[in-house]
C-alpha cells in the first residue's frame, strides 16, 4: 500500500492507515537473499556438489524473482499519487513479476520446501502483496472489479491459514505483518460491503492483538487498539438496520446498479458531458473514520461507483490476471481520496485532475469539511469574503464545528475559499459542499461560461439530529442512500427487508418523476441539464432534490439554514416545492406509517 508519509509534499490520500500502509524497506544487498538460500542448500543437503544443478537453479531463480518483486513493490511509494499516465508501465512490470513469482512457487513448491525452507507465512506474504497490488490498482483506476480480486487473495490467505504458524515464532515483526494483513483485508471488505466478513475479521484481529501484546513488550498496543475502535465505530455508522425475517442484518449496496439512475425519456434534450474525475475530500473534525477514510468520504466514494463485476480467473488457485483480461474502458470516474489535505496538497491534486480532464468531461469536487467563517464586516463581497472550508495545516486543529479567524485584517490561510476554485471553472465543474459554511459557495460567479453547479448542504440541523454528526452527515447520506436518510429523519431505526424493497421501488418512481420535473422545467438553469446526461450526476441531482423537498416538508426542519441550497438556484415551485413531488413524499411516509412527521399542506405552511 502506497503512503504519502515519505513524501511530505503529498497527502496520505489513499485508504492507508499508519498501521496498514507501511512498505518494508528493500534489502540493502540485492543478492544477499540468494547467497543465504544457497548456504541453506549446502547446510541442509550436505556438500554443495551433492545438490542437483536443476534444484540449485530453481532456488536461485526464486530468490531473484522474490528480490525483484520486493524492489518493484517498494518502488510503488515513489510513484506520484496524482496523474493517470506516469504509473501504468510501472504497475505492468510489477504485475508481471508477481505473476511469475506466484506461478513459480506453485510449480516448484517441493524443491523450495526442501532446499530453500519456504514457509507458509512467506507464501502468505506473496499473496498479500498481490492483494495489495490489486487494491492499489483499484485506487488508481477506480475499477471496483479489482477489489474482488484483492478480496480473493486475502480470502485465500485466511482460508489456507498461511499465517497460522507465525505466532509460534519469537519474531514480533512477523506478527505485525499478520496484523497488517488483517487491517488491509478489513478495508477491502468494507469497500465491498462484506460486513459479515468484517465482523469475523475484527474478532480475529482482536484476538491476535491481545496475543501479540501479551507475548511481546510492544509500544504500539495503543495504536492497534485504536484500529479496533475505529473499525467498530465505522461498522455502526449507518443509522438504520434492514432486517431479514430471522432478524439477521441485510447488507445493502449503495453503488450504482444497472437500474439505479432514472432513464432519460426518448427525445429528452440533455448535455453529453460525462463525469471523468472526482476529488473526494474529508476534513471534518471528530467524524468516524477508518484507514484515512471518513464515513462521508466512504459514502460519496460508493455513490460514484458502479456495482463491481467479477474478473473471471483462469486459475484454480489465486493468481494474476493477464492484461488482456482487464476492462478496456473505464466504468467509473477516476477518483482521488484526500484525507485532511493541506491547501497546497489539495491544489496540486486539483490541478492534476484539471490538466488531464478529457474533452466533454466533468470534474467533480466533493468537500466534507469544517466551516471557516469570516470575522467582522468587509467592504466588499468578493469570493474571499465569505470564508469557506478548512484545509489542514501543521499546527494543531482546534476542536469544534467551525474555525474562526482571529486576525480580522487577513483572510484565513488554511481555507479553501470559493475564489480558489475560480481558475478551474474553465472546464465543466460539479461541486458538492457538505459543511457548516457551505453557503459561502453560493456566491459563485461563472466567469468562463462553462457548465457549473454547486450542491450545498444545510449549514445547521435541528437539535434532535445534531448528536449524530460523528456518524456522518445527513446531507451526504441522502446523496448516498436516500431511503436510509428518509427513515432516519422519520425516527425509524430498523425495517424489514420486504418493506425496504417496496420503498426502494417507490423511490425509483420518485426519482423518475424528479427527472421529468427537471427536464420539463422552463425556468431551470441550463447548467443542470448539461450535467443530466451523465448517470452519476443525474442520480446525485435527483437525490439532492428529494433531500431538499423532504427537509422542507419535515416538521422539525423549520429554519432556512436547515435546507440545502444550490448554485444556480433551482426553481422551487417546479422542483423542491412541487406539489406532485410533495404528494409522493407523503405517500412514501404513509407506506412507512410516519406521515405525522410531515406537513400535509406544505405550501400553505411556509
Swiss-Prot record:
Record flagged with keyword Transmembrane: yes
Topology within the bilayer: Single-pass membrane protein
Domain of life where this protein originates: Eukaryota
Primary site of residence: membrane
Region (Necessary to inhibit MRTFA-induced SRF transcriptional activity) location: 1-212
Subcellular location(s) of the protein: Membrane; Nucleus; Cytoplasm
Keyword terms: Cytoplasm, Membrane, Nucleus, Phosphoprotein, Repressor, Signal transduction inhibitor, Transcription, Transcription regulation, Transmembrane, Transmembrane helix
Gene Ontology cellular component annotations, sorted alphabetically: cytoplasm; nuclear membrane; nucleoplasm; nucleus
GO aspect biological process, one term: negative regulation of Rho protein signal transduction
Segments for region (Disordered): 1-35
Pfam families assigned to the protein according to its UniProt record, in alphabetical order: SCAI
Residue(s) carrying Phosphotyrosine: 64
Entry GO MF terms: transcription corepressor activity
Residues passing through the membrane, by range: 472-492
Region entry Required for interaction with MRTFA, spans: 71-173
Entry function: Tumor suppressor which functions to suppress MRTFA-induced SRF transcriptional activity. May function in the RHOA-DIAPH1 signal transduction pathway and regulate cell migration through transcriptional regulation of ITGB1.
Family designation: Belongs to the SCAI family.
Subunit structure: Interacts with DIAPH1. Forms a nuclear ternary complex with MRTFA and SRF.
Protein name: Protein SCAI
Organism listed in the record: Homo sapiens (Human)
